[in-house]
Amino acid sequence: MEKNKIHILVVDDDDRIRDLIKQYLNDNNFMVSSAISSADAKTKLSQFRFDLIVLDVMMPGQSGFELTKEIKNVMNVPIILLTAKGEVES
């Protein structure tokens, strides 16, 4: 891991979206790790320190909202939640 670079964890079950975000962040000189699920993200969070998490809301198993609550109970890291949903449900 390179020192002095902002380390971002990208969590998304969609390979295309995850790879697009990773590529953009890498191109802009950020250090990027990725996870394909909440379980994978928890493993990465136990191994590394992150400065920011970019997290998909709608994932199979544990949602991004549920994972956010868990993360916030144990660490103080900024989280950006993303969704591909185009409509608000009542």
Regions found by a protein language model. Give the residues of each.
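Non-catalytic signal-transmission and effector/linker regions of two-component phosphorelay proteins
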Residues: 1-7
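The feature encodes the CheY-like receiver
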Residues: 18, 60, 87
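Charged docking surfaces used in two-component/phosphorelay signaling
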Residues: 19-27
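Short hydrophobic/Thr-rich beta-strand motif most characteristic of the beta2 strand and flanking loop
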Residues: 29-37, 44
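Acidic catalytic/metal-coordinating carboxylates
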Residues: 37, 63-66, 90
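Short amphipathic alpha-helix used as the core "switch/output" element in two-component signaling
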Residues: 43, 62-76
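Active-site beta3 strand of CheY-like receiver
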Residues: 48-54
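Active-site residues of response regulator receiver
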Residues: 56, 83
